[in-house]
Amino acid sequence: MKLLSKIMIIALAASTLQACNGPGGMNKQGTGTLLGGAGGALLGSQFGKGKGQLVGVGVGALLGAVLGGQVGAGMDEQDRRIAELTSQKALETAPNGSNVEWRNPDNGNYGYVTPNKTYRNSTGQYCREYTQTVVIGGKQQKAYGNACRQPDGQ
């Protein structure tokens, strides 16, 4: 729990700094960097113990921030909303190996989520490994992640 608290503090500090980005506050790339970094840190925290776990958090945060910044630079709010809803649907209902697609008709951006593996982690939570692929302005980006059901069912 201490590690999760540290991650949340880092994410809050990063969002506060990013909000100082000038007029208009946080931009798409900044949002992608922040969310990618936080997600990467959370993913990295699932591996190792002690100092090894801290290394996992650091590496996950760095890789997530880089990839999230690249993807976020091209995604608009509508893209993110559609992609998030599609991700939830895919992780809840799609069989492993199947693509659940999304498309923004306003700008032509699209992507898909592919659940790859369902498992229970060391604390008994149900989890899924997945691949998220987005095509923004004709350029494809892939990200890999794990999502675990929380005790409240979310």
Swiss-Prot record:
A lipid is attached at residue 20 (N-palmitoyl cysteine). The keyword Lipoprotein applies. Pfam families: 17kDa_Anti_2, Rick_17kDa_Anti. A lipid is attached at residue 20 (S-diacylglycerol cysteine). Residues 1-19 form the signal peptide. GO terms for cellular component: cell outer membrane. The keyword rRNA-binding does not apply. InterPro entries: Anti_2, Gly_zipper_2TM_dom, Surface_antigen_Rickettsia. Belongs to the rickettsiale 17 kDa surface antigen family. This is 17 kDa surface antigen.
